[in-house]
Amino acid sequence: MKILLRNLVNLFARNKTAALLNIAGLTVAFASFMLIMMQVWYELGYDRCYPNANRIYGLCFQVPQSGDLGTVLPRPLAEKLLRSSAGIETGGCLSYQHGDPNVPFFRPERGPESAIAAGFSLVSRSWLDVFGFETLSGDLNAFSEPNAAIIPHSLAVKLFGSENPVGQTIAKSEGYREAAQFTIVAVYRDFPKNASLKNDVYTDLKERLLQDFNNCSTPYFVRVKQNADIRRIEQDLLPLVWNYAKTYDEDSTRSQRLRLVGLNDLYFF
C-alpha cells in the first residue's frame, strides 16, 4: 500500500495538469451520475406516497383510433361503473370544472389583505378514502357538512401559526361560484412534490354533475380489492361503457374500451 501511494504521489508530481484534469473529470462525472439517479428515483417514485398506491387505478376511456387515454368521465356513468364490479373497493372523483389552482384565502377577522394563495378543489367524499388522506387534526367524517373544508398542514401554519385551525373559518375573495367562507374540519399531511394530488383546500363536490351525462370534467380513481383481477374488472364494466357509447355513435359501440391504469403507469403514459 505504501508503495502504491508513493507511486501515485510521484505520478501526480510529474503530471500535475493531467492529474487535476482527471480528478475534475471524475468529480463531474460522479456528480452528474448522482443527479441523474436522484431524478430517476424521483420519477419512479411518482404517486407512490399514498397508502395502497399499488391498488389505485384511474378509470380511462381508450380512444379506438389512436390508443390515447381519456382521463375524464361523465359523473353519472362513472358512479354506475363503481357499483358494477365486485373487485372495486371504493372510488371517487375530482371536478375540473369547479376547481381553481390559485385562490386567495384569508381569515375573515384579518381581511383580504392578509390572503395567501392556495389551490381549491371540489372532490367526492370517497376521494379522500381512495388516496388515504392522513389527518393530523380534526375529523374527515365532517367533510360533507355544509361549507366544510380540509386544508394541508403547510397552509394551516401560514394562516394560523401555532393555533389549532380546526373549527376556524377561512374565506376566499368574493366573485367565486362557491360559498365565500368555509369551516375547517380537518388538517391533512401535505403530499410530496412527486404526487399528482396537490396540497389544496378541499371541499365536498356533493351532488354536482350527478345528472349530467354530457359533462366530462371529472377524473375518477378507484381502489381495487387485494389481489383483484384488473382485466376481469374491465370486462365487468364494459357493458355499461358500450351502452353509454351507443347513445352517441351506434357504429362504434363495440370499439369503445375502458382501461384501469395504475397511478405510476398513468404518469408515464
What is the role of each PLM region?
Residues 4-13:
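A short amphipathic helical element positioned immediately N-terminal to and/or at the very start
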Residues 10-11, 19, 267-269:
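Membrane-interface anchoring determinants
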Residues 36-104, 114, 209-210, 215-223, ...:
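Membrane-proximal extracellular/periplasmic loop immediately following the first transmembrane helix
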Residues 63-65, 105-110, 172-176:
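Short acidic, glycine-rich loop/turn motifs
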